[in-house]
């Protein structure tokens, strides 16, 4: 029975949820399914157990699982590979008399197959990894299914279980030397885990290994095995039916379903095992070496690729099987064409998640190379040993030294080449839980004969998986013959032949299986050999012999023999749907481990769920916490041993872990309750719906009967269910599980696993996804579509967005005319083979966003195809048959799931443009390097870690994009002579040495380069911003033709003059955000420089040589310390000059620059844009500014102007005078501004506005907010009225509290002068705090923003400032709610910023969000409660989700053609970012989406970030986007929007969602102001500057917001900005820092040494009397200066900035500096200690140069809990309290201090170590005294005057104590110390910030680990002598016992020891120490060697009765003798 559509009403409360749960359980339309997931899912869904007889015989073997094996399993942690029981396979038994032959298979293949393992020992057990999962899967499941076709019969056999056998001697040797342990399957899980961790090396394949077909021994072994038996044994080993070619029986196929394998199991397979390694290779027959009979010619896997798979989680190992008769088997027949076109079979052995869950996978036909195997003996050649080799572990000997590549040697006995490849360290990946995909099983496809016609004509079924399904199982076709079923199955598996079929067999030729992975070589054919010979050089790089060709064909990577590279991923024919929990192997970096989680919120639910577990894992060792300098080991053999700081490595680990955890979060289904019923809403074709209750295992075919009953459908016919996401619908397979699909889509939409997902299906979720129930009918076109089709031409066919399944019939008649075809956005589209073959002119094909998970097979038949676009799909592999598209020139595979490419790519000789961006490549797809005609490659947004050497073969490549990867090193590219552009942005590159001779454009933004040296002679543009670069130079050759150089956001402290001398052709130079104090004189050489930007540095002056830059047009110098112009600047022809935020004043009037400007100059005529905000200019500068006669834009905001009447500029269009001291505006002056469009006069002292402003007819922006306006608007003859300014778009009166707009009707003009509706263009009207007595105010609408509220909310003052920028529409909405929900302690502040708004009529969605959000939040708070913080956070989160649901519900209606108010079709690609601040009492909750940020500024100079930016380029956001099927291009999600979370964006769902990040803060007295702003503010201003401005205007948030806006515009912002400021406490007053000296309490100095300090409190006057004196010093500064002079210049500037900034905040006086040491005085102990603590914290958070953090004295150190306690420069501090002698320096006018007090303070500082604060006893006593006073105030409730004597002093101290308590402190008694130069010892106390208290423990441990003392040195000598005595006794020495125990020999007396130490230097002591240690090591080594060689240690004695004795007894006897001798001597 159908029901009407729901209205999507919300569930109200937990009680309602429980009722719905009960209804769901009771209303299930299907049978109750109480079976556990772990019991139900692993069973085959074919229901074949109900059938018997021939029906079972037609099917493949079905795998059954023991339900017990997983019934208690909830996560992967509980599944141990070694703890599994053997699993049997139930099958129909048909015994054969030949069964004993099959059982003898292991013994007959003993010499052939097990020899593979012997060979693997030579390659450091790497070949063992070639088995990959195969080895692992057979570890405990000793089974195989056998299907033999013998004598024309098709029979089935039971699985054969092979008994354990006793290993041979050779096998035993192999186990030892290959690193195998004797652990068996019965070992404990703990031992297995240790074994897993013990093997961490993955050896790449030796590319120069000779094929086994050349081995005479191989042929001999092959001949010894009878052909019949070999075929049967091969069937046993491979588990497939192998047919004799002479029988003539059609091949049949086993199609097991692919199952993801757990990574832990894979690692377990890596560990060599004595029983496992041999049996695995035996059971599965997988060739581990290139010398195997199946791997020599068309090897299914190379060593390197299998090694990669060994760490993967879901990859398929394939075996190419070819049947060649014994008479034709020879070493030459393997490559023959006849061998390639015999009847072929295929099998695909799949990895298993764990060893108890075998499953079958779909597979296609493949060929088998029948080259015999070789048996290679153990190599006895010497190898390189590591110094730390464990001699007791024989397996350790075979481990190759990673940096060493052992040269290949020839085995003369067998004629085979063996090589020991370079080792690559591959860390173990994270553990995973069991996914639903891993538990699902599929029935094997039925076997049938391959009929050629049906095979070529079969339909390719477009995969329906929206990357949301579990593993799919193939349903059993009904009513079809075996041949028909077989052919269809084969087509679904995309069988393609390696090349175009000949005429003879074009219809009857059976296409082979497409290449399943990058490592699977293509078929043998002449074209393949030719391309290999042509493109792949050998070791000499000049030719390629036949052996190299054969080796190349068996090696997917196609690398030359000299190449050793990290293996690429296997990409088998498996369905890795996104519900699989497995991860690709290459997700684990060869350099970076994947542990630690990122603080960024990729999925709050998962982070919260695992936070407890993460906290239990310490990052560093307990005994030694600091991290040494890390030497990166690149996969590329050219990678340098570059140093990287531990901080970066830890961050890499966090980023990598985030990726793994995020993928795990969405793909793990282990938390599902298999018995729980989930609600799902399914719609009918008439838009009615019904809600079903299903278990997770319920399939589509099980739901369809229930739906028929629900919808009362009695008609006959087939029905199906489609899934609609966005605008695309995909038909679900009968075996699909809708509940799992629904669940994952909900997670991708922002819901969490902890949410009630089981009842959410009751609601209308059609805005995200929609299940449609409909009959199976052909496509129906709308009239518009039919007209479009009829009108379309037949040459260029456009069939986009038509929901097609096949091309319309009409086009079949014109296929021969089609040249280009576009079928994009048709999710079910299939292009039949007939259509493709008949389109003989087809040149271009676009299949974008068809949501295919498989490569459309038939398109490889379009042999003339030139352009192919398949972006935005889920394609996991490219078939090898793509080689047939030899004419292909353009190939776009962007945004797929590719991990590798097939070897057939080498046939694409004409390929020129290749786009592989936004895929899953872990390793560079090296096969593309042999497409030598490539001109452009895009591999951005992958996870590539290194570039192989073979990249140099792309000699024609002009442009290469590798941005957003994980590259760490770029090596030599000198042979790529045509390379012009190289994009390497956003990688991890620390070193680059390309030597690219013709490279012109190089982009290196956001990498880790600290020193740039490269040879790029033709470089024209270099972008190297956001790198920790401290020096830059060019090796050997300088790029003289360079025109653009960008070095922004680096750490440069100077620019080498030689660099600028060589770059004489430079036109653009950017040096922003560095630490430059000057520019070199050589800048004058840049005579062609046009653009120069040195903003946000520390420049103290403009170099005079700058005046010689005659071509300079734009000069940006804002945010520096420049005080004056330079002579000669008047000769520059600048058009734009920005000197904002400098120290310019009136001094310019005194130099010649002013006089030269007065008489006319080039600058006065050329300058058009002059930005000079935030300086010290005043009215005396008007004559200078008037010289710029052509000035268009003048910005003089925040200067000292008080009168503009002297301004004579008439051509001005934009005038900014905000923040000055203007009180009036001259009418005559205004009349000169006839062209004025923008006038900013806010934050002045204006009382009235002249009437002449009405004459400014072009005025569009007028801001007079935050003034003191008080005038009568009706007096329009004398005061300004806006009636005549019709072009006004922005008008702001906010902040004028005395200004009144009163209704007044003028009879002269018969109009109301207060009417604001007369301004038709008005977009923003600010009337906050303005008195309104008129109704003539326009109503707010979608393109008009009105503010009329007061600037107080809940007693707290707030202010808003905004600007339209260059937009003509409203894009941001702010709203506040006072007394939210009627509660006095609640308020709500919201800021909604639009994205992708319509430029014509504004932004609709942001307005709707503003109007409805508060109501939604109220409902959610009522629903979830507000009793706890968690309840409120949940309500906030669901408020955004519900908001997004309602917004997209409206957009969904628009998309369906409904008429929705204020929304149009254009809004489907628009949305809004939101930041919500909810304050409840003292708790502040911040929730945000997108890039609007909120900052909490504190009065102690600190701040707290409350929000997180959701950008698509952030790795955690990017991973989520990719999992959901989206992509990122140019920093935008799907190329549309630059945020990853937002409300709206209907067309981007589920790639974008609305789950917010939420933070909670408990407000304290230190919290001063809240700043919420759109993203443009943070782009142009740093957070410190924002907080400084907010702190400066803490009492007036409206002025603070306005000043922030004005500064952003002065710094270059031209876009819209909205800023909201909230002062958190009522009656906040600006208070100065006080001292105990009354004279200094009220006075402040006003000199500014740095413009960054200008906004802070002025420096205090020097304190006198009792004061706190602090000395600071940098630890190891001399060493660092000598080691890194350039880096230390940058580091010292950072250090000084922190010191001086904190001094201003806490009120200290800088006495003087000596080098890097500071001497500082404070008037109170509390202020001094607070400053010390805060400086230590700031130093820890500073950005230090890479060189500083790469050494031990500056590296990152973490404590046991993982908290960083040291990083960067380490500063020691000493503080003392006393009364020094003040003395004023007459020259510097600085106060100095003298006397014993100063000396003692300096000595106390000398006691401290780096990071410590040493306090004298006097200071400690004074501090305790003040704290007792504070305790009396707090606990005793005494008044400040009673406690402190004076109230003002008490206020100061109490405020400082509050700051101190907000930081926290920890004191440790350091004991008494003798201070240098002082008589008495001083009791010293060490202080730390509270969060750094663990520093003390580290310092104590570090102190104990320092150099040994004298006593320890001589003790070591005693040990050495005693060990040598033992050696002498063992060797039969003649030294008597009494001589050996004499004190003079064994031990010096104290007198001798003192004499030695006094006579030697420190260097001699170190040499003595080294000598003693060497002696000890030698003795120990000799003793160990003797112990190993003999059964014991024999003491040689002179008497003949000496007996053999153990070494331990000998030692005991010797010690007893020594003791007895001592007793006798005493």
Curated annotation (Swiss-Prot):
Basic residues composition-biased segments: 44-58, 471-485
Residue numbers bearing the Phosphoserine modification? 433, 487, 497, 562
Origin: domain of life: Eukaryota
Instruction: Enumerate the spans annotated as Ras-associating domain.
Output: 676-755
| Keyword line | Acetylation, ATP-binding, cAMP biosynthesis, Leucine-rich repeat, Lyase, Magnesium, Metal-binding, Nucleotide-binding, Phosphoprotein, Repeat
Q: Which SMART domains match?
A: Ad_cyc_g-alpha, CYCc, LRR_BAC, LRR_SD22, LRR_TYP, PP2Cc, RA
**Which top class of enzyme applies to this chain?**
lyase
Q: Cite the InterPro entries for this sequence.
A: A/G_cyclase, Adenylate_cyclase_G-a-bd, CYAA_C, Leu-rich_rpt, Leu-rich_rpt_typical-subtyp, LRR_dom_sf, LRR_R13L4/SHOC2-like, Nucleotide_cyclase
Residue positions annotated to bind Mg(2+) are: 1673, 1716
Annotated positions of the Phosphothreonine modification: 376, 389
Q: How is the cofactor bound?
A: Binds 1 Mg(2+) ion per subunit.
Q: Which residues form the signal peptide?
A: none
User: Which residue numbers delimit the Guanylate cyclase domain?
Assistant: 1668-1805
Cite a single GO BP annotation: positive regulation of Ras protein signal transduction
The segments carrying the LRR repeats are 795-814, 815-838, 842-862, 863-885, 886-908, 910-931, 932-955, 957-976, 977-999, 1001-1016, 1017-1040, 1042-1062, 1063-1086, 1088-1109, 1110-1132, 1134-1156, 1188-1209, 1210-1232, 1233-1256, 1258-1280, 1285-1308, 1319-1344
- Biased composition (Low complexity) is annotated at 282-300, 575-601
Q: Please explain the role this protein plays, according to its UniProt record.
A: Plays essential roles in regulation of cellular metabolism by catalyzing the synthesis of a second messenger, cAMP.
Question: What protein does this entry describe?
Answer: Adenylate cyclase
Provide the species name: Saccharomyces cerevisiae (strain ATCC 204508 / S288c) (Baker's yeast)
């Amino acid at each position: 029975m159908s029901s009407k559509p729901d209205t999507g009403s919300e569930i109200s409360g937990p009680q309602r949820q429980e009722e719905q749960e009960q209804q769901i359980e009771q209303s299930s339309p299907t049978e109750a399914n109480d079976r556990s997931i772990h019991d139900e899912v692993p069973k085959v869904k074919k229901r074949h157990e109900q059938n018997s007889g021939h029906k079972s015989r037609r099917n493949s073997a079905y795998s059954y699982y023991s339900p017990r094996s997983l019934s208690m399993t909830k996560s992967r942690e509980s599944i141990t590979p070694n703890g599994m029981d053997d699993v049997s396979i139930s099958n129909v038994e048909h015994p054969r008399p030949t069964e004993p032959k099959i059982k003898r298979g292991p013994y007959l293949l003993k010499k052939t197959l097990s020899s593979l393992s012997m060979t693997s020992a030579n390659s450091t057990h790497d070949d063992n990894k070639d088995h990959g999962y195969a080895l692992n899967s057979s570890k405990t499941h000793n089974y195989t299914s056998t299907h033999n076709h013998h004598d024309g019969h098709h029979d089935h056999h039971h699985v054969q279980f092979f008994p354990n056998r006793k290993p041979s001697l050779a096998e035993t040797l192999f186990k030892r030397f290959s690193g195998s342990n004797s652990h068996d399957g019965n070992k404990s899980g703990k031992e297995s885990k240790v074994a897993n961790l013990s093997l961490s090396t993955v050896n790449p394949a030796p590319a120069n290994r000779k094929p086994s077909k050349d081995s005479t021994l191989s042929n001999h072994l092959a001949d010894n095995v009878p052909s019949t038996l070999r075929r049967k044994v091969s069937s046993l080993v491979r588990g497939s039916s192998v047919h004799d070619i002479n029988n003539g029986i059609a091949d049949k196929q086993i199609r097991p379903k692919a199952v993801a394998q757990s990574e832990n199991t894979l690692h377990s397979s890596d560990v060599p095992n004595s029983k496992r390694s041999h049996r695995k290779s035996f059971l599965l027959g997988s060739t581990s070496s290139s010398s195997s009979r199946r791997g020599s010619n068309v090897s299914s896997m190379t060593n390197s690729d299998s090694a990669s798979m060994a760490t993967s989680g879901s990859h398929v190992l394939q075996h190419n099987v070819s049947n060649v008769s014994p008479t034709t088997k020879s070493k030459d027949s393997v490559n023959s064409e006849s061998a390639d076109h015999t009847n072929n079979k295929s099998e695909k052995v799949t990895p298993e998640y764990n060893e108890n869950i075998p499953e079958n996978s779909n597979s296609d036909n493949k060929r088998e190379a029948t080259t015999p195997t070789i048996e290679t003996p153990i190599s006895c050649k010497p190898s390189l040993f590591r110094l730390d080799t464990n001699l007791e572990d024989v397996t350790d000997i075979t481990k190759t030294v990673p940096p060493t590549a052992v040269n290949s040697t020839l085995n003369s006995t067998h004629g085979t080449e063996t090589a020991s490849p370079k080792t690559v360290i591959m860390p173990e990946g994270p553990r995973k839980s069991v996914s639903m995909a891993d538990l699902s099983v599929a029935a094997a496809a039925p076997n049938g004969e391959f009929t050629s016609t049906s095979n070529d004509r079969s339909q390719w079924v477009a995969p329906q998986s929206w990357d949301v399904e579990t593993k799919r199982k193939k349903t059993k076709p009904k009513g079809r013959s075996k041949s028909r079923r077989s052919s269809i199955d084969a087509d679904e598996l995309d069988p393609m032949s390696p090349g175009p079929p000949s005429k003879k067999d074009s219809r009857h030729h059976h296409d082979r299986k497409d290449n399943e992975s990058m490592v699977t070589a293509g078929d043998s054919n002449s074209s393949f050999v030719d391309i290999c010979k042509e493109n792949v050089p050998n070791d000499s790089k000049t030719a390629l012999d036949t052996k190299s060709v054969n080796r190349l064909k068996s090696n997917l990577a196609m690398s030359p023999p000299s190449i050793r590279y990290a293996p690429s991923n296997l990409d088998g024919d498996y369905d890795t749907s996104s519900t699989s929990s497995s991860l690709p192997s290459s997700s684990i970096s060869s350099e970076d481990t994947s542990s630690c989680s990122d603080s960024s919120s990729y999925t709050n639910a998962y982070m919260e769920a695992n936070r407890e577990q993460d906290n239990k894992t310490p990052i560093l060792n307990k005994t030694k916490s600091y991290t040494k300098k890390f030497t990166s080991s690149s996969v590329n053999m050219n990678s340098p041993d570059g140093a990287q700081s531990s901080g970066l490595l830890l961050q890499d680990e966090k980023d990598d872990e985030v990726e793994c955890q995020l993928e795990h979060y969405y793909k793990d289904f282990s938390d599902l309750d298999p018995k729980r019923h989930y609600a799902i809403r399914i719609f009918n074709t008439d838009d009615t719906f019904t809600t079903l209750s299903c278990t997770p295992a319920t399939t589509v075919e099980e739901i369809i009967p229930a739906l028929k009953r629900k919808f009362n459908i009695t008609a006959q016919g087939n029905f199906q269910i489609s899934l609609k996401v966005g605008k695309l619908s995909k038909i679900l397979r009968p075996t699909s599980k809708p509940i799992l699909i629904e669940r994952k889509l909900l997670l991708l939409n922002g819901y969490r696993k902890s949410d009630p997902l089981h009842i959410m299906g009751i609601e209308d979720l059609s805005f995200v996804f929609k299940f449609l129930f409909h009959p199976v009918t052909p496509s129906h076109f709308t009239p518009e579509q039919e007209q479009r089709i009829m009108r379309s031409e037949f040459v260029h066919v456009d069939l986009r967005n038509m929901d097609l399944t096949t091309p319309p019939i009409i086009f079949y008649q014109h296929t021969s005319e089609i040249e280009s075809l576009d079928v994009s956005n048709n999710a079910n589209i299939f292009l039949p083979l007939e259509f493709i073959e008949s389109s003989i002119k087809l040149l271009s094909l676009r299949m974008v966003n068809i949501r295919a998970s498989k490569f459309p097979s038939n398109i490889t038949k379009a042999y003339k195809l030139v352009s192919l676009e398949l972006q935005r799909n889920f394609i996991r592999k490219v078939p090898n048959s793509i080689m047939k598209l030899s004419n292909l020139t353009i190939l776009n595979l962007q945004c797929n799931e590719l991990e590798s490419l097939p070897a057939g790519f080498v046939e694409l000789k004409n390929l020129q443009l290749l786009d592989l961006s936004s895929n899953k490549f872990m390793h560079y797809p090296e096969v593309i390097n042999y497409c030598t005609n490539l001109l452009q490659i895009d591999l951005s947004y992958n996870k590539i870690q290194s570039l192989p050497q073979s990249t140099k073969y792309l000699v024609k490549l002009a442009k290469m994009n590798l941005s957003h990867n994980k590259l760490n090193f770029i090596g030599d590219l000198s042979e790529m002579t045509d390379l012009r552009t190289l994009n390497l942005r956003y990688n991890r590159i620390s070193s680059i040495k390309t030597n690219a001779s013709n490279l012109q454009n190089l982009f290196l933004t956001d990498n880790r380069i600290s020193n740039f040296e490269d040879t790029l002679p033709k470089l024209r543009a270099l972008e190297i911003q956001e790198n920790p670069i401290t020096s830059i130079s060019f090796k050997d050759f300088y790029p003289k033709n360079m025109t653009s150089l960008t070095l922004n956001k680096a750490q440069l402290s100077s620019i080498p003059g030689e660099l600028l001398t060589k770059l004489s052709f430079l036109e653009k130079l950017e040096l922003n955000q560095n630490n430059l104090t000057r520019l070199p004189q050589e800048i004058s050489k840049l005579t062609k420089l046009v653009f120069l930007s040195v903003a946000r540095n520390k420049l103290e002056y403009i170099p005079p040589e700058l005046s010689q830059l005659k071509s300079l047009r734009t000069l940006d110098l804002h945010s520096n310390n420049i005080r004056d112009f330079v002579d000669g600047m008047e000769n520059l022809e600048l058009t734009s000059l920005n000197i904002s935020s400098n120290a310019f004043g009136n001094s310019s009037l005194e130099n010649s620059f002013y006089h030269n400007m007065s008489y006319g100059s080039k600058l006065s005529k050329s300058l058009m844009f002059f930005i000079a905000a935030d300086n010290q200019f005043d009215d005396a500068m008007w004559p200078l500014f008037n010289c710029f006669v052509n000035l268009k834009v003048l910005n003089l905001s925040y200067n000292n102007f008080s009168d503009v009447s002297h301004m004579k500029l008439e051509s001005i269009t934009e005038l900014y005078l905000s923040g000055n001291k203007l009180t009036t505006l001259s009418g005559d002056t205004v009349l000169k501004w006839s062209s004025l469009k923008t006038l900013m006069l806010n934050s002045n002292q204006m009382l009235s506005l002249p009437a002449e402003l009405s004459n400014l007819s072009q005025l569009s922006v007028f801001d007079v907010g935050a003034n003191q306006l008080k005038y009568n608007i009706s007096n329009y003859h004398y005061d300004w009225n806006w009636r005549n300014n019709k072009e006004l778009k922005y008008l702001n009166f906010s902040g004028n509290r005395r200004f009144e707009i009163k209704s007044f009707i003028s009879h002269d003009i018969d109009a109301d002068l207060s009417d604001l509706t007369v301004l038709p263009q008005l977009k923003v009207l600010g009337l906050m705090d303005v008195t309104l007595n008129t109704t003539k105010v326009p109503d707010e609408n979608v393109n008009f923003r009105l503010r009329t509220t007061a600037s107080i909310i809940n007693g707290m003052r707030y202010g808003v400032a905004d600007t339209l920028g260059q937009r003509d529409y409203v894009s941001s909405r702010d709203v506040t709610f006072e007394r939210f929900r009627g509660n006095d302690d609640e308020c709500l502040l919201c800021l909604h910023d639009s994205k992708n708004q319509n430029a014509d009529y504004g932004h609709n969605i942001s307005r709707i969000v503003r109007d409805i959000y508060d109501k939604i939040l109220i409902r959610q708070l009522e629903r979830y409660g507000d009793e706890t913080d968690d309840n409120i956070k949940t309500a906030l989160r669901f408020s955004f989700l519900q908001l997004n649901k309602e917004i997209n519900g409206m957009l969904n209606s628009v998309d369906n053609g409904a008429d929705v108010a204020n929304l149009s079709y254009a809004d489907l690609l628009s949305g809004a970012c939101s930041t919500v601040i909810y304050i409840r009492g003292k708790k502040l909750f911040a929730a945000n989406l997108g890039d609007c940020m909120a900052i909490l500024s504190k009065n102690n100079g600190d701040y707290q970030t409350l929000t997180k930016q959701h950008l698509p380029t952030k790795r955690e956001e990017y991973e989520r986007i990719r999992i959901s099927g989206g992509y990122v291009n140019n920093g935008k999600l799907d190329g549309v929007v630059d945020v990853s979370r937002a409300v709206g964006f209907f067309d981007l769902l589920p790639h974008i969602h609305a789950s917010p990040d939420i933070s909670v803060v408990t407000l304290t007295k230190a919290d001063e102001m809240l700043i919420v702003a759109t993203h443009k503010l943070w782009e142009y201003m740093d957070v410190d500057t924002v907080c400084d401005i907010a702190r400066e205007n803490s009492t007036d948030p409206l002025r603070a917001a306005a000043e922030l806006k004005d500064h952003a515009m002065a710094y270059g912002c031209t876009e819209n900005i909205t800023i909201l400021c909230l002062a958190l406490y009522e009656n906040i007053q600006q208070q100065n820092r006080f001292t105990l000296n009354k004279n200094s309490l009220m006075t402040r100095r006003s000199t500014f040494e740095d413009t960054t300090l200008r906004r802070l409190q002025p420096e205090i006057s020097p304190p006198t009397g009792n004061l706190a004196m602090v000395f600071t010093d940098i630890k190891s500064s001399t060493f660092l200066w000598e080691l890194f002079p350039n880096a230390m210049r940058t580091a010292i500037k950072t250090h000084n900035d922190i010191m001086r900034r904190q001094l201003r905040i806490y009120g200290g006086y800088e006495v003087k500096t000596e080098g890097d040491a500071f001497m500082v005085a404070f008037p109170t102990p509390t202020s001094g200690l607070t400053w010390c603590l805060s400086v230590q914290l700031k130093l820890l958070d500073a950005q230090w140069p890479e060189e500083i953090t790469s050494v031990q004295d500056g590296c990152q150190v973490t404590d046991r809990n993982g908290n960083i306690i040291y990083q960067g420069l380490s500063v020691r501090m000493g503080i003392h309290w006393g009364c020094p002698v003040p003395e004023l320096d007459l020259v510097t006018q600085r106060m100095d201090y003298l006397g014993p007090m100063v000396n003692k303070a300096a000595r106390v500082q000398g006691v401290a170590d780096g990071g410590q604060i040493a306090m004298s006893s006097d200071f400690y006593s004074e501090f305790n005294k003040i704290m007792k006073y504070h305790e009396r105030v707090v606990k005793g409730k005494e008044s400040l005057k009673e406690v402190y004597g004076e109230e003002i002093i008490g206020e100061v101290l109490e405020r400082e104590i509050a700051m101190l308590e907000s930081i926290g402190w920890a004191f440790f008694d350091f004991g008494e110390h003798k201070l240098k130069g002082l008589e008495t010892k001083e009791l010293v106390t060490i202080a730390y910030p509270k969060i750094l208290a663990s520093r003390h423990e580290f310092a104590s441990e570090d102190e104990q680990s320092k150099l040994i003392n004298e006593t320890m040195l001589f003790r070591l000598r005693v040990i050495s002598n005693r060990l040598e005595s033992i050696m002498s006794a063992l060797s039969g020495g003649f030294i008597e016992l009494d001589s050996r125990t004499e004190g003079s020999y064994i031990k010096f007396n104290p007198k001798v020891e003192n004499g030695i130490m006094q006579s030697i230097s420190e260097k001699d002591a170190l040499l003595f120490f080294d000598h003693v240690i060497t002696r000890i090591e030698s003795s120990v080594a000799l003793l160990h060697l003797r112990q190993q060689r003999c059964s014991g240690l024999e003491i040689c004695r002179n008497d003949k009765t000496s007996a053999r004795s153990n070494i331990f007894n000998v030692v005991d006897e010797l010690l007893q003798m020594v003791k007895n001798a001592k007793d006798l001597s005493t």
